């Protein structure tokens, strides 16, 4: 039995290990990969490897893996990458896994600055990336520093602004919070809808020369071929849609494009190496095929995939709605529980206050009762003394009378009687004054006792009211994805039909233009970042982008402009560059 060969395939978010036979073809390996990851939209992807010269190359599906210029190492290393890009992610990318693989690849391109992205858009995209990773912002879970381990912005953007890590996190967090309620899958799609409007998105650039020998860039993308000046890869100067191209061929380093318009001359350019022309040819054929396919009705397979995706999305939305409903119920229950706890605490505090007031009133009552008793005793003592004095007065009166009588009876001398009389009279007067004083004191004590009695009755009434306040029971808690330098020429006819006249891409607008929410967010971010920007660190791309913005240009307005005039006029313009 032939010895198997170890293969490692790296997708954007996983590493896969396979054992293949020496006669395994590129397609067999590719099929094994897509089956393993559950991918059905296979037409966008390919397997990439580094050849023995160090060039990045796409694995040919119709040849054996071992017959291709793959570095002989163990295991053989491949990357599973998107080779072709859709025109409109929201219309063409059906499966969640397809969207996710594109999202991760595009995000990597933006973060590495392979795709130029202005600062304000970079921050907005970062917030969608965070939503796709973490879901809704939760202050209880997403504490300060929760984004510390994530690379979210291009290094260029970080260096151009006087903001530290925490300040960047604060800004991204604010926009993360804005996406509350958005499914992770929807955040991925929103990211791609904004990213696809970036000028360098989905473009394969090749260094070429025209007949004059001018150094230019050729851009191959989903919509056609575009020509760029050497110092500006953001703004194409001439464009040729796939619908205008009849045949593409190369002979060594010379590449020839024959337009459908037979009155127009051939579009000729030169690449630095034969392998470049081979790659351009392959990309042109693949992109043209997809361009034509998009302008025809969906195949049964695609229709089924879309139906299944709609059903899965609907199911997720239903599940999300149920989860949200349960979450709201749980939050309401928690709030109710907190409210009950709060009310319980308030009532317990009120009860404590009442108990303290009652205790204080009780103490006051006891004090007033004690004073009342003391006053009563004083009153009784004063009364007793008054009675005693009255008795003594009476006795004095009687003694006086007896003396008078005795005077009469015994006929004492006038001087003696007068003396005794005077003494008794003085004594009587003193006793009368003492009696009146004591009676006055008794009346005074009687009034004080009456006031104390009234205070006592009032305190008793307050105590009775306080004591009658019902005891508060504790509330119940709620439970609740070329190298061959031989074969120096190749040609491919690009078939066309009536559908090719569909150039609807020229009518497209950017996501920011049609989505008021995105427009508002980008405007706010532009204003917010302006104060922190270090103008001295602007790159050439920053200045080109700023000029395009000033002139009101965007990707699709530029596309319409560079396709104006007939094919001959645009080819003549290319030759004169």
From Swiss-Prot:
The modification N6-acetyllysine is found at residues 79, 139, 165. The modification Phosphoserine is found at residues 74, 407, 527. PROSITE patterns: FERM_1, FERM_2, FERM_3. GO terms for cellular component: adherens junction; apical part of cell; apical plasma membrane; basolateral plasma membrane; blood microparticle; cell periphery; cell surface; cytoplasm. A motif ([IL]-x-C-x-x-[DE] motif) lies at residues 115-120. This is Moesin. It comes from Homo sapiens. GO terms for biological process: cellular response to testosterone stimulus; establishment of endothelial barrier; establishment of epithelial cell apical/basal polarity; gland morphogenesis; immunological synapse formation; leukocyte cell-cell adhesion; leukocyte migration; membrane to membrane docking. The [IL]-x-C-x-x-[DE] motif is a proposed target motif for cysteine S-nitrosylation mediated by the iNOS-S100A8/A9 transnitrosylase complex. It is found in: Cell membrane; Cytoplasm, Cytoskeleton; Apical cell membrane; Cell projection, Microvillus membrane.
């Amino acid at each position: 039995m032939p010895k198997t060969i170890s293969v490692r395939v790296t997708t954007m978010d996983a590493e896969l290990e396979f054992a293949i036979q020496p006669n395994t073809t590129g397609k067999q390996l590719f099929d094994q990969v897509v089956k393993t990851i559950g991918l059905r939209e296979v037409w966008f992807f390919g397997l990439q490897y580094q050849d023995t010269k160090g060039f990045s190359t796409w694995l040919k599906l119709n040849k054996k893996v071992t017959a291709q210029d793959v570095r002989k190492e163990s295991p053989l290393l491949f990357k599973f990458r998107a080779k072709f890009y859709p025109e409109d992610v929201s219309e063409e990318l059906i499966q969640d896994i397809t969207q996710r693989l594109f999202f991760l690849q595009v995000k990597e391109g933006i973060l590495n600055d392979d795709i130029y992205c202005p600062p304000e858009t970079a921050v907005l995209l970062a917030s969608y990336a965070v939503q796709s990773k973490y879901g809704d912002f939760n202050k209880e879970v997403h504490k300060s520093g929760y984004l510390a381990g994530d690379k979210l912005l291009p290094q260029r953007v970080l260096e151009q602004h006087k903001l530290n890590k925490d300040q960047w996190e604060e800004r991204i967090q604010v926009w993360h919070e804005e996406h509350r309620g958005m499914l992770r899958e929807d955040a991925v799609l929103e990211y791609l809808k904004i990213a696809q409007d970036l000028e360098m998105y989905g473009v394969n650039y090749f260094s070429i020369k025209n007949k004059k020998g001018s150094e230019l860039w050729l851009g191959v993308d989903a919509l056609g071929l575009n020509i760029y000046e050497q110092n500006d890869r953001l703004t194409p100067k001439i464009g040729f849609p796939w619908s205008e191209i009849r045949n593409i061929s190369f002979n060594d380093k010379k590449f020839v494009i024959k337009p459908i318009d037979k009155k127009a001359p051939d579009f000729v350019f030169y690449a630095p190496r034969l392998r470049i022309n081979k790659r351009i040819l392959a990309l042109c054929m693949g992109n043209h095929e997809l361009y034509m396919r998009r302008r025809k009705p969906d195949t049964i397979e695609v229709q089924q995939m879309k139906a299944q995706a709609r059903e899965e999305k609907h199911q997720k939305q239903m599940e999300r709605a149920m989860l949200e409903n349960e979450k709201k119920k749980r939050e309401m229950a928690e709030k109710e529980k907190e409210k009950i706890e709060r009310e319980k605490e308030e009532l317990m505090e009120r009860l404590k206050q009442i108990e303290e007031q009652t205790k204080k009133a009780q103490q006051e009552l006891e004090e007033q009762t004690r004073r009342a008793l003391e006053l009563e005793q004083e009153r009784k003592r004063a009364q007793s003394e008054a009675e005693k004095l009255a008795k003594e007065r009476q006795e004095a009166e009687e003694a006086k009378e007896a003396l008078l009588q005795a005077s009469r009876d015994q006929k004492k001398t006038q001087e003696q009687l007068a003396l005794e009389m005077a003494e008794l009279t003085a004594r009587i007067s003193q006793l009368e004054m003492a009696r009146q004083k004591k009676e006055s004191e008794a009346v005074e004590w009687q009034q004080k006792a009456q006031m104390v009695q009234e205070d006592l009755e009032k305190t008793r009434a307050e105590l009775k009211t306080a004591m009658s306040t019902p005891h508060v029971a504790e509330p119940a808690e709620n439970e609740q994805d070329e190298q061959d330098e031989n074969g120096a020429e190749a040609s491919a006819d690009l078939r066309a039909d009536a559908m090719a006249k569909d150039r609807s891409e020229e009518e497209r607008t950017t996501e920011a233009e049609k989505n008021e929410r995105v427009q508002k967010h980008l405007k706010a971010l532009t204003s917010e970042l302006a104060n922190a920007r270090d103008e001295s660190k602007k790159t050439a791309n920053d200045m080109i982008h700023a000029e395009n913005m000033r002139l009101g240009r965007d990707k699709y307005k530029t596309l319409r402009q560079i396709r104006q005039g007939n094919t001959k006029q645009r080819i003549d313009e290319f030759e004169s560059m």
